[in-house]
């Protein structure tokens, strides 16, 4: 089972794609059943497209967004449309604080995107909102903490804590896909700053604002 994530892409590295396709190939060599479940697809180089097309021949493929499904069809890969299983998580029974805005940045993005998010956070504070900056990858996101040092910051890699805060907040602004997914699971309005096609694809699927 190759499940839940954006593994079939070269944005991280071609080596990453090679690794996951090798896992699929080994599984088939040992006559194991293989399923691609709720993945996104792309971006891929022409080389990556050829490798993925070959690796997925005869494999059941379920993709988690419409853009990935259309991409698969252009590549001649039969696939069905699913959704991220995290959307099925029940939100905790926590009172909603309408003035609380959860801001979820990400390290490793263009400085312009972080600046946009920082300016938005400052403006929300000026308008009387409570802004909580949530860092979901402690260590990796430390450079982001410096950018938002004047704001309240919490670090966690626990999805249960993220879901709790998303359910508590009145609004979520996220650069990270799972910040958006758990906001949707909690029924909290959200907006996306897209660093990756999968983020824009999810926002588009749900009718949320994104840029």
Regions of interest found by a model, annotated:
Residues 1-211:
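Active-site anion-handling motifs in enzyme catalytic cores
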């Amino acid at each position: 089972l190759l499940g839940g994530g954006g593994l079939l892409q070269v944005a991280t590295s071609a080596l990453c794609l090679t690794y996951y396709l090798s896992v699929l190939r080994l599984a088939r060599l040992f006559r194991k059943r293989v399923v691609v479940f709720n993945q996104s697809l792309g971006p891929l180089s022409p080389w990556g497209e050829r490798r993925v097309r070959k690796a997925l021949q005869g494999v059941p493929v379920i993709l988690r967004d419409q853009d990935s499904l259309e991409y698969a069809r252009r590549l001649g890969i039969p696939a069905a449309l699913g959704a991220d299983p995290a959307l099925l998580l029940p939100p905790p029974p926590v009172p909603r604080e309408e003035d609380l805005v959860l801001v979820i940045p990400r390290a490793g993005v263009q400085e312009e995107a972080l600046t946009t998010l920082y300016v938005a956070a400052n403006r929300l504070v000026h308008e009387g909102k409570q802004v909580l900056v949530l860092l979901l990858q402690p260590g990796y996101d430390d450079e982001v903490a410096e950018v938002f040092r004047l704001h309240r910051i919490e670090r966690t890699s626990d999805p249960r804590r993220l879901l709790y805060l998303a359910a508590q907040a009145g609004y979520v602004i996220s650069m990270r896909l799972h910040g958006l997914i758990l906001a949707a699971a909690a029924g909290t309005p959200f907006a996306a700053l897209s660093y990756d096609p999968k983020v824009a694809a999810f926002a588009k699927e749900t009718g949320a604002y994104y840029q």
